[in-house]
């Protein structure tokens, strides 16, 4: 079943290769969507794919790349048209 989740990741998540690492992990898991920095220092990600793969990526967001220090990940289900790829915005 295809699911779509919007995530907000807080902590030390900018300037630590978080977006590039998220894209790499998403591609590995077959998840589509996008990831971007927010002006308030958080990172926002939209994840779409098979429920199991999206859940695996959500769990990975709590760790992130080596230099990241994630303190919170908020997520909510959203409904959007199907996405074809994963991109860094």
UniProtKB/Swiss-Prot annotation:
Gene: acyP
Catalytic function, reaction form: an acyl phosphate + H2O = a carboxylate + phosphate + H(+)
GO molecular function: acylphosphatase activity
Enzyme class: hydrolase
Family, as annotated: Belongs to the acylphosphatase family.
Protein name in the entry: Acylphosphatase
Gene3D superfamilies for the chain: 3.30.70.100
NCBIfam families: PRK14451.1 (NF011022)
Species per Swiss-Prot/TrEMBL record: Nitrosococcus oceani (strain ATCC 19707 / BCRC 17464 / JCM 30415 / NCIMB 11848 / C-107)
Superkingdom field: Bacteria
Active site per database record: 19, 37
Keywords per UniProt: Hydrolase
E.C. number: 3.6.1.7
Domain Acylphosphatase-like, chain residue ranges per copy: 4-89
Cystine residue pairs: none
């Amino acid at each position: 079943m295809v699911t779509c989740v919007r995530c907000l990741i807080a902590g030390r998540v900018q300037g630590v290769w978080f977006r590039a690492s998220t894209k790499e992990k998403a591609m590995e898991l077959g998840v589509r969507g996008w990831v971007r920095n927010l002006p308030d220092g958080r990172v926002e990600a939209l994840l779409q794919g098979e429920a199991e793969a999206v859940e695996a990526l959500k769990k990975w967001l709590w760790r992130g790349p080596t230099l990241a220090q994630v303190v919170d990940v908020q997520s909510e289900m959203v409904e959007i048209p199907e996405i074809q790829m994963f991109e860094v915005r």
